[in-house]
Amino acid sequence: EKDVEAECSFRVSGKQPQLWNPVTGETRYLTSFTDNGTVTTLKLLFDTTQSYFIVFAGKTDHRTGEPNFSDKADLMTLGGSWNVSFNPLWGGPDSVEFKELSDWSLSEVEGIRYYSGTAVYNKLFDLSEPVNGRVYLNLGNVKNIAKVTLNGHDLGTVWSAPWEIEITDALTSGENKLRIEVANLWVNRLIGDEQLPDDGIVGEQWPQWLINGEKRPSSRYTFTTYKHYSA
């Protein structure tokens, strides 16, 4: 998966192009483009599955010829181990060490493989010297939503490609404390519960333990009124 550069032409003339990012809310002027009196042409850089709104408005006062997108360079890779905390109330193993980032559903630990909910990833990393320019954290492939906190600063939530978030203002020289809260889908727990005795709805009969407000007899964690899956 690589960035894609595209030369895009729009049937508009005499207007200043702007880029509106629907994921981050960023809006900015595009400074490099040509206008032949009928069509405006400019180059756009897209990450995987990324999209923009291009808006034309006002006079072309911001055409400087500077590239519309800055060059990217990898600053560091946050490899190695992570401390990950799950919620034991939902079958998780509390705090564990991941030697490397991995897919929960492939774990040999049932409490992780079938976990559904939020897990918290914590990691310390060092930055030897200040960085010039803007810095972004790329999370890779997230399943399915992540909230990022760096050095106590809530940086927001990432929920779609390109799975990155700006960390410039929260990043410091020396030690940095990164916290990422990741939430997945319900299906993991549904699949795990399906391995246990069924104490749910039978036909049209609701379970007596639910009607009476009693503790359920099985070790299932969830309850659904409709089985919309095969497991």
Question: Could you tell me what each predicted segment is?
Answer:
Residues 1, 12, 141-143, 171-173:
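A generic beta-sheet turn/junction motif
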Residues 1-118, 126-133, 167:
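Carbohydrate-binding surfaces of carbohydrate-active enzymes
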Residues 9, 125-151, 158-159, 178-182:
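Aromatic-lined ligand-binding clefts that engage carbohydrates, nucleic acids, or primary amines
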Residues 121:
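Extended, loop-rich substrate-binding clefts of extracytoplasmic carbohydrate-active enzymes
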Residues 126, 165-175, 186:
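Short, surface-exposed tryptophan/glycine-enriched loops
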Residues 62-117, 173-231:
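An acidic-aromatic loop/edge-strand motif
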Residues 155-165:
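Aromatic-rich membrane-interfacial microdomains
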